[in-house]
UniProtKB/Swiss-Prot annotation:
Pfam families: NifU (PF01106). Belongs to the NifU family. Gene3D superfamilies: Fe-S cluster assembly (FSCA). Disulfide bonds: none annotated. This is Uncharacterized 10.3 kDa protein in vnfA 5'region. GO terms for molecular function: iron ion binding; iron-sulfur cluster binding. InterPro entries: FSCA_dom_sf (IPR034904), NIF_FeS_clus_asmbl_NifU_C (IPR001075). One of its GO terms (biological process) is iron-sulfur cluster assembly. PANTHER family: IRON-SULFUR CLUSTER SCAFFOLD PROTEIN NFU-RELATED. Signal peptide: none annotated. It comes from the Bacteria.
Length: 96
């Protein structure tokens, strides 16, 4: 099984987009909340900031800020969201 492509601004705009429907927003929130304790155990935290089209924006906090593993963390959230939403076009990007 190959790894999904890295989430970058460029990839987010060039790949096919299947928007996340409004009725799935509670599932997005629940998934982020379910994953937060694992991130918090390492001294970091996640905050859901926005969902637009197929892009989920998360604010990284605590030890996640500037951490070399933050891209891995976002990738893990993406994998979970792709699975629970059954939407391979979901992208998870850091909030500006």
């Amino acid at each position: 099984m190959s790894n999904p492509p890295l989430d970058t601004e460029e990839n987010a705009t060039t790949l096919a987009i299947t928007p996340i429907p409004a009725e799935s927003l509670p599932l997005v929130r629940e998934t982020v909340e379910r994953l937060r304790p694992g991130v918090q155990r390492d001294g970091g935290d996640l905050e859901l900031v926005a969902v637009q089209d197929n892009i989920v924006r998360l604010r990284l906090k605590g030890a996640c800020v500037g951490c070399a593993m933050s891209a891995q963390t976002l990738g893990g959230v993406r994998r979970e969201l792709v699975k629970v939403l059954d939407n391979p076009s979901v992208r998870v990007l850091p909030a500006p």
